[in-house]
Regions:
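Conserved N-terminal phosphate-binding loop of PLP-dependent enzymes in the Aspartate aminotransferase
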Residues: 1-466
Length: 466
């Protein structure tokens, strides 16, 4: 019997299998495999219902920044439940945690991004950002500026509009899209840039591609450009030097708002509360944030806008209509209380400083995997990393999708106590930000062994010659 559960591991598996629809389910394997259920966690480790212990190399899902088992978080959440667990955020009503958290975040955002709308997840944050963009341009008397430019292989969520912003075609199979609102430009993917092109030339080509798209669609029809500072689910794509500054300049020149999707990069993953200015040197018009904002202890997100946007959006409408964007759980007091305590922990323990100090060591140790024949590139920054696996290091040719190389590596790693995320030919890592150098050594040792075991399997099966 599991601790704090009246059900056995087998009973929990069956209930989950029979009744829960999970995100990103492979129904070809679902009936047989079901879910592996994680029941407990502490620090950087999670434990399944059978008591097996794993290093959580994906931080829940890019989000458990402060690590698991924080008693002070549990206490803050419990205290808020006792005080007032919920009240309506509509019609000029609020609770104390929303304003406190808003002020704390405003102290840490770049520029004058001081106003924020709270939600419950990154998809909602990005959906809300587009609603704000449309409302803003309507208020400015430019109602045609509705289009949004996104990028191929970008990931911005899975609500109806956020799914359209997402540029990963595989994620859209079988679903209808709101694609008429979205235009896509090239992915800033240096490893797979056109053959014969230098990084500098590639950077120029990307900017030309954006400028051509704006010219084709018409700046008068484009409301915003949205970009992750480092692309997450698209493969941890770090753009060429100066890319974000140059895209922002193009947007400003064409009267287009700039949305920085910091759902993954925010709250310390790259060593700063927000990466837009501190890492990439830009101050966008909108920042969207979730995941690390509460370290996953409660569902929370924020759509953060500039003073100029707020000034325009807060002008009373001539017909007396209300600003009607809102959700039942916007500014939820328990979620906001978790966000407050999360920031206090990050500050008290200087977790951002820890990431700036230890993150380069994680990069260095993972970089040693480049010597393995199967590894084409190790990339990323600090605690946001990826290994791209290839059939041929020189040509960068991929193994056939049915080989499932990323999944094989992840399976070998998990058997030895490490969870990494497989995405086709990639393995993605986003561990809790509290990971130490000793834990990094263990992490990379297991991952190296998993890649080597996969290499041996592929050679033995005759699907790869090494």
């Amino acid at each position: 019997m599991l601790r704090n559960s009246k059900y056995t591991a087998e009973e929990l598996w069956q209930k989950d299998h029979d009744h829960v629809i999970h995100p990103f389910t492979d129904f070809a394997q679902w009936d047989e495999k079901g879910s592996e259920i994680m029941a407990e966690a502490e620090g950087i480790h999670v434990y399944d219902t059978h008591g097996n212990k794993f290093i959580d190399g994906i931080g829940g899902l890019w989000c458990v920044n402060i690590g698991y088992g924080r008693e002070e978080m549990a206490q803050a959440i419990a205290d808020q439940v006792r005080a007032i667990p919920y009240y309506s955020p509509f019609n000029h009503l609020s609770t104390p945690p929303a304003g406190i958290l808003g002020a704390m975040i405003a102290e840490r955002t770049p520029g004058d991004l001081d106003h924020m709308f709270f939600g419950t997840g990154g998809s909602m944050a990005n959906d809300t950002a587009i609603r704000f963009v449309h409302f803003y341009w309507n208020q400015k008397g430019k109602p045609n500026k509705k289009k949004v430019i996104s990028r191929i292989d970008a990931y911005h969520g899975m609500t109806y509009l956020a799914a359209a912003l997402t540029g990963i075609e595989f994620d859209k199979i079988g679903f209808d899209q709101a694609d008429e609102l979205v235009e896509y430009v090239a992915c800033p993917y240096p490893y797979r840039r056109p053959e014969g092109m230098t990084i500098e030339e590639f950077g120029d080509w990307l900017i030309e591609d954006l400028e051509k798209k704006i010219e084709t669609v018409g700046a008068e029809n484009i409301g915003a450009f949205i970009a992750e500072p480092i692309m997450g689910a698209g493969g941890v794509i770090v753009p060429p030097e100066g890319y974000h500054k140059r895209t922002l300049e193009v947007c400003k020149a064409n009267d287009i708002l700039y949305i920085s999707d910091e759902v993954v990069t925010g709250f310390g993953r790259l060593g700063h509360y927000f990466a837009s200015e501190a890492v990439f040197g830009i101050v966008p018009d909108i920042i969207t944030s979730a995941k690390g904002i509460s370290s996953g202890y409660q569902p929370l997100s924020a759509t953060i806008i500039s003073q100029e946007m707020y000034d325009v959006m807060s002008i009373p409408q001539a017909d007396g209509a209300l600003f009607t964007t809102g959700f039942t759980y916007s500014g939820h007091p328990v979620c906001c209380a978790a966000g407050i305590k999360n920031i206090e922990i990050i500050d008290d323990e200087d977790i951002c400083g820890h990431v700036r100090k230890v993150g380069p060591y994680f990069e260095e140790k993972l970089g040693e995997l480049n010597d393995l024949p199967l590894v084409g590139e190790v990339r990323g920054k600090c605690f946001m990393m990826c290994v791209e696996n290839v059939a041929n290091k020189e040509t960068k040719e991929l193994l056939p999708p049915e080989v499932n190389v990323g999944g094989r590596i992840a399976d070998h790693a998990q058997k030895n106590g490490l969870i990494v995320r497989p995405l086709g030919h990639l393995n993605i890592m986003s561990p809790p930000l509290t990971m130490t150098t000793e834990q990094i050594d263990e992490f990379v040792g297991i991952l190296k062994g998993a890649i080597e075991a996969t290499q041996d399997d592929l050679v033995r099966e005759g699907v790869w010659n090494g």
